[in-house]
Design a protein with these regions (language model features):
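Conserved alpha/beta enzyme-core scaffold
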Residues: 1-434
Length: 434
């Protein structure tokens, strides 16, 4: 291998110079979540007149996302594979797109021969080690595949990016252009946990046994669950994300990862999202490893851990057990993310469980989230064939192996009391006596 330090020096340029190098690109992507380089995305928008409908395909962003605004639609067309607050309007408009996909498949989509093969990848990584390897730091997921397979790779070298371990490195020789800029990493503070989420979290935690391996999704409910696990022993983590709450349980000795069949003694994830406390803890820490999403979220891999428990949120559940976790008010709100990946992996696991958890109502109690049937056009995220446990603040419904009539009865019992009679009437019309 040639002297990487000399190669490094020859690749240094400004953000604007780097964007000039991709003026002929047709499709690009960014590092996921906190691996997105704001320095580079801002330079992209600043040089927007170089482009004509450049496709920007990626998942969640915590940046400004100005490339997704209507005022820039002449230059960029945003293609969301998962939708966040800053890209939601574009994804539901004529000037943007949404591509349905399971999270574990995104690495393949961005592969060399994938349906979304890239002309360029823009991201931020850690400073190189003595051998010239940079860590992806905060997001390995599809970011690694996209970086390895894009025609041009532009990376911001940022000393604030933690050096996370695992299958999570890129060599300087595989980066085409380098921007040296140290910018603080965006921090995502945990959501506020209310009384309803607290009750749901307590029910979820009651299904977790000592020695189980956990996956927890995003939101207030997973945070609430973590608060009720402090009396458990030897829990493990194999999850698409690691948050601050997981670090707290590691420090308490609750999470040891000792009982895992796969990757024992290590917490496995594909991205990190939280505060500086999390980033500092993960830095050069062999207790946490990041791996690509086609490993971490692959249901076949997930199932290799016995007693795998997945806990994910939802927007609605109908009386057949179908789950909507991505669609609100006739609009695409988010995406399936890794929910289906882990629902299937957990239920395939020996002794595994899948939990879908949601408050019983929304709209300040005026709308039931347990519904007779979905409105026309609402997509099914997790099918009725995959669903296992559903939990609200009113209890636990175990649906696996149950008939449609039995499911309806169980789900009505955990619906908000104000809506149970209406749901019973509709269920009676379909099924007769429950």
């Amino acid at each position: 291998m040639k002297n990487w330090k000399e190669s490094y020096k020859s690749k240094i340029c400004t953000p604007d110079e780097a964007i000039q190098k991709i003026k002929d690109a047709k499709r690009i992507s960014f590092g996921h979540i906190c691996s997105e380089s704001s320095i580079l995305t801002e330079a992209l928008v600043r040089n927007k007149k170089l482009f004509k409908k450049l496709e920007i395909a990626h998942l969640l962003s915590v940046g400004k996302s100005e490339y997704a605004k209507e005022e820039n639609s002449e230059y960029f067309r945003h293609n969301a594979l998962f939708i966040g607050p800053k890209t939601r309007e574009a994804a539901n408009s004529s000037y943007g797109d949404y591509t349905p996909t399971f999270f574990f498949e995104t690495a393949k989509l961005f592969g060399k021969d994938g349906e979304l093969a890239l002309d360029a990848m823009l991201l931020q990584v850690s400073t190189p080690d003595e051998h010239g390897y940079c860590s992806y730091g905060l997001s390995c997921d599809y970011t690694k595949s996209a970086t390895e397979n894009a025609k041009i790779v532009i990376a911001q070298i940022n000393k604030f990016v933690p050096r996370t371990l695992g299958n999570c490195f890129v060599h300087i020789d595989d980066i085409d252009y380098i921007i040296e800029e140290d910018t603080p990493i965006p921090e995502v503070q945990p959501p506020v946990v209310g009384e309803i989420e607290r009750k749901i979290g307590e029910f979820c935690a009651s299904l977790v046994r000592d020695g189980d391996t956990l996956q927890l999704g995003i939101g207030a409910i997973p945070v609430a669950v973590l608060n009720f696990l402090k009396d458990k022993k030897d829990l493990g983590i194999h999850s698409e994300m690691i948050s601050d709450g997981i670090v707290d349980l590691i420090n308490l000795g609750v999470i040891t990862n000792k009982k895992k069949n796969l990757n024992p003694n290590k917490a496995i994830a594909t991205f990190l999202m939280g505060s500086k406390k999390l980033y500092d803890y993960a830095n050069d820490n062999p207790a946490i490893e990041l791996h690509p999403v086609d490993y971490v979220n692959n249901p076949i891999i997930i199932a290799q851990n016995d007693n795998m428990v997945s806990i994910n949120s939802a927007i609605q559940v109908d009386l057949m057990g179908q789950v909507n976790a991505e669609y609100v008010d006739s609009k695409q709100f988010s995406g399936p993310g890794g929910q289906v990946d882990f629902v299937r992996g957990a239920t395939m696991s020996k002794g595994g469980k899948s939990i879908i958890a949601l408050p019983s109502t929304t709209g300040k109690g005026t709308i039931s989230r347990i519904v007779f049937t979905f409105d026309e056009g609402v997509p099914v995220t997790t099918s009725r064939n995959d669903v296992d446990y559903v939990i609200t603040e009113y209890g636990i419904a175990h649906l696996r192996g149950k008939t449609l009539r039995e499911r309806a009865k169980l789900l009505i019992e955990i619906a908000h009391p104000n809506f149970r009679e209406e749901l019973r009437k509709k269920a009676f019309e379909k099924f007769g006596e429950l």
